[in-house]
């Protein structure tokens, strides 16, 4: 369910090419201002049964002040119940869960991503040649060393040290506590390493092949002798005493002692509850002694002991031969974003791959840390020589766990949590596209392929004009509050994608500039190696204007409906050859675009719609999003009786066919009709065919740079489509239109359409002036080039013979000139950094 709701179609398809979907760019003109207001909260919760859920670590638990241990939602059950609920007890492995929480205040929205897991008590093994695959000391050594050897990565130790002072997560570790704990851990690691080496030498003469890091901990930290016979217990049982933890400043309630010669004290029952105000009653009950429901003691069987040495040789997991079991754990990431940010960039659908992978990586680190701490605590002696002991508790169901906030003072755990939060913040601020695709060598290779394809003068002219126009658009956007979009039309997808790669760094210089300093793309987007965004969940509508112009409205208040739509014509680009089903031909003949499906796809072609025909049925279906039925009839223009129209089999063939393809992509086949059918459709009483009405009513609101086949949009000779698109661009949610007009600023949106088949390049603009400028812009509006629509002015120009060189920002006529030959020559040299430098200093 999570895969189909939040994953892009290609990112989880193992057979897909890693280069697809690079054309998708984030649609914001600049980084949203409230990105800094996005907060991340990581919480580690433990479930030991008996409805006892304990918070072990909370990133908001700083300065010695405990947070809300219940973690209640504003209207729902406790968050701890949401983390662990509805999971079968027989389920093994890690489970990912997602919840939409009630926000703490109406101005924010909150989401919770939970990784539910159990620790791996067996750990890794040793191969037959006795070469250790994973050492018990690896966790301590790796955690105390650098996170990464690459100094440029923000997850290195330098980045950690530089951000430690600014991190509220690490402020709770005062100057005196950290060196002491660090020294203890360092000396502990050294002793463990030496002891492990000696134990490996001792094992070299044995036949043991299944030693785990957990038992290497036991070997190196303590020597377990054969227990003396005890008439009150099993002869191999070990008594639990109380100890003290220097890390937690609390009582270490269980500590397995190697001295069992004395009789057990009934008052010192194993795994007592932690010493806090909520457990006084339990402590009184424990002191009564001879409790009927006393938890079983951990018993080490005789088979795993060696009477001739002080080390355990070949042993399975300590929990496998006893009734004691480890607890279950939940790692929850709670994301809180401002309402405005959520309307533009849906955090779950946009960053799901990154969020899930970062939390899974943190979960693996926590698994190793808990496993080691658990066995160190279990193996610590009664003389309290253990420096890393953590207070333990045990439930009546024999599950062993830690006390409340037991890991809140563990430096290694805090570092792991802080590193994860640092990576999340870096990922949210990074561009949503793989930066390495725009490296110098890749860009040169792509540019040379395009120049080799441009052989005719018309092709070369289009190539130069397209580069110059894109550059001028970008320059004007930097200097003024202008929005623009670029649409490439072509019947050949590979050619259009090459142009997308070429124009992307010109429109987004940060993509290329950050490629050397950004995190490793494989670490950010490990599955696909590309951007992990989907279409953005937002709400918009074209404004109503006076006059005869009909502007369609769009309802995008959709929850969890971000899907990839693959739009392609029924007539393939390789018409002379039969259609092949291979993935390579599929990718080369179709278009990998992302759209909000219920806004850009007619509801009548929904796979779940029973009236849309049996050919729409597929094994994998989407859930129908909410809020679609209200605007379903408006998908077709002037349709009153949709049901009667759909009953006709003759009319069904004019509807786009929607099928679910590999990886969850939605395929939309646009059926082609001839001119006669279109002319009949215009005079007929039945609704017009999709080829006439147009399948998509506007350009995608989330992407500045787009590509599509020519027949997937309304004809660009239709003024209604052009004006509707430009009007929406004026109403960009990232701008405060009323404030800009109050400041007497001239608003403008621009649209450039390049048809790579006909070598034509058209630019469209729309202007909106303050009311005080009523007499000032009259000379600027020439009747032969402009149409007045209410109080908005639309202008279109055919610049097939050349691109504009300079846009006069003052209200005067445009000055048109040929393409910028000097800039084009810089591009042809292939030096991407030099090209970006020229762009930024023009």
Swiss-Prot record:
Principal subcellular localisation of the protein? cytoplasm
**Which GO cellular component terms, listed alphabetically, does the Swiss-Prot or TrEMBL entry include?**
FNIP-folliculin RagC/D GAP; vacuolar membrane
Annotated region (Disordered), positions in chain? 1-20, 142-209
Question: Which organism is this entry from?
Answer: Schizosaccharomyces pombe (strain 972 / ATCC 24843) (Fission yeast)
Instruction: Write down what this protein is called.
Output: Uncharacterized protein C30C2.07
Cite the dDENN FNIP1/2-type domain residue spans from the record: 777-842
Q: Which residues form the cDENN FNIP1/2-type domain?
A: 430-772
Name the cystine pairs: none
- Sorted alphabetically, which PROSITE patterns does this protein's record hold? DENN_FNIP12
Q: Which UniProt keywords apply?
A: Cytoplasm, Phosphoprotein
